[in-house]
Every structure is written in C-alpha cells, then in structure tokens.
C-alpha cells in the first residue's frame, strides 16, 4: 500500500497493491474501512468504468452507481478508480477539488483526461499511478492508425507507451505531474495486471481533498 500527498497538501492519495487483495471483489464495507483508516475519508465513491470520456460528480455517484471514467468532487469523501493495466490518475486543482480518472488507450483517445480537467479549477496538478508500460504493452489492433494520428510519439515498434500519450495530453492542457509510481503493472509483480493474467482482479487508487479543505 502506498500513500502520496500533493506537495502543497491539496490532495491525499492511496494506492493498494497485490498484497492488499482484489479491491473490486472486496465487500463494500471492507473498501470503506480501508479508505477510512488510510485516508481518513468518510466514504468511497466508485463508478462502473466503461472506457469512456464521461465525467461524474461525487454528488451524482452518491445517489446511485453510475457509468463513467472520471469522478470529480471536493471534501472528505474518497474518489476511487479500479485498474489492472490502465492508467489511474489523480488530478487536483489549487482549491482542493479532486478528480480520479481511469485512462486506458480508449479513454485517452476519447479525451477523458481533458474532460476531467475541464471540471476543475486553475493550476491543476497530477499524480499518475501504476500502469502497463511500453516494455510490455504490445499493441497490434486495428485502432493503431487512429492512435498514431492522435499521439504520433506513442508507439515504439509494436509497443504502446501510454506515458507518451498521457504526456502529450498534459502538455496540451497545462497539467503538471507532481508524483507517480514508475512501475509497470505487468512486470513489476506488485500490482494486478490484466495482460499479466489478472483478468478479474483490480487494485484501488483513491484520493480525497487535503486536510485544510476537509
């Protein structure tokens, strides 16, 4: 389990690992207890992730579980994303509003990161969680030409770099990376990896606003 605080305290982040178990299958009460203990969060909100560019507010997610791939909120509730190769991203603005984003290649191409950042205020910073990297992400699908057109620098031979694609998006929208985990989910062994055989299991990345806003 890994904790990260944004440098100015605007947001707090928690990332679970393989040793913490499958957080998708875990009972809701266990997930809630986890974020309460490690993030001092009042609740955990999640979405039914569908590889889209849909952004859902914490208030909407609290009413009922909704489909989408980015959650935006403010305050002591933890916003979460479940992944096993896609990129889990935490965005936070200078006012303490937070977004958690699920970004695989489909989401990046659809503009989920831009859509989430648009729902935040100024001076947005980012934490980038563990995901599959170019060392292991062989990609030969028919979608490749479209991805190469949008992200010309994202392919190294037959291997896809989600980092390169994400870096281009951040540069275009003016988001600064202030933290992350420089590990590949497939070859590090510390996290679940869909391509590494973890077809159903997922690890959790969760975040809430910093203490001064809670």
Question: Positions of the model-derived regions?
Answer:
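Active-site microenvironment for binding and transforming phosphate-containing groups
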Residues: 1-214
